Amino acid sequence: MTPDWHSSLILTAYILIFLTGLPANLLALRAFMGRVRQPQPAPVHILLLNLTLADLLLLLLLPFRIVEAASNFRWYLPKIVCALTGFGFYSSIYCSTWLLAGISMERYLGVAFPVQYKLSRRPLYGVIAALVAWIMSFGHCTIVIIVQYLNSTEQVGTENQITCYENFTQEQLDVVLPVRLELCLVLFFVPMAVTIFCYWRFVWIMLTQPHVGAQRRRRAVGLAVVTLLNFLVCFGPYNMSHLVGFYLRQSPSWRVEAVVFSSLNASLDPLLFYFSSSVVRRAFGKGLLLIRNPASSMLGRGAKETVEGTKMDRGGSQAEGVQSSEFVTE
């Protein structure tokens, strides 16, 4: 079936997100894996690694969305595939919101209480925070599977064609709409409020300390702006559809487009990684060099680069003499 213009537009968006997000997140994964393997990694390393994994989960499931869009949003795969891909797709989105909130809290605590934070931070805290984010997202998104067994793939038209998690009966809506509202409140508005407060304080501290370098100030502002864009542009439309749907007692017609914006998160997060970590900045730089010169190879140099990156970050912090500006991943 040839996709119409609407499906073609969404199909193009999904393909672009996949092509830009996958290589960038794979580079970030390689960089963060090197950091986490080091003794006593900071909690933020673990959170950033898990955010990368959440993005990769979404990107690996994106081909199913691409096939769906190419088929004019008719679902020709088995019903269980609809349930499992939807579960993983939406779980990755909502896991990202609390991971972003956790990263913002770590940044704020690092600059507001630098001495206490440095003395008390433990890798275990990052592991616990990441586990909580995954458990909350997986637990809430089981609604996708529950609704599947309420026959969430509904026949449309007269050709025995079905859609995936799109057309609902009244029985399904009675289950879906209240849960979507709770998802919106607990997994979007609460972490967004935490993130806005933490980055507001974080940026204010960074900009008002005279001994913080201009480059670090720019990275602090960039980090806050990218994170805020993530919430407002990527997650905002999709979660607003939950509020509108609950009020109207039916799914709004623009939910499909809102899901596309949520997927854009996987392409926007690498910018956050870039502002967060000097290791990622070097990895992206080496990736560009590799594209320009395919004969060169980065294999086998990860551990050496990670050690060098650690020394460079620490040296830079000492040179600036700013205890409270350790927002750059060490």
UniProtKB/Swiss-Prot annotation:
Highly expressed in hematopoietic tissues, such as spleen and bone marrow, with highest levels in a subset of immune cells, including monocytes or neutrophils. Expressed in adipose tissues with high expression in differentiating adipocytes. Expressed by intestinal endocrine cells. Pfam families: 7tm_1. It is found in: Cell membrane. It comes from the Eukaryota. Residues 306-330 are annotated as: Disordered. One of its GO terms (molecular function) is G protein-coupled receptor activity. Interacts with FCN1 (via Fibrinogen C-terminal domain). Belongs to the G-protein coupled receptor 1 family. This is Free fatty acid receptor 2.
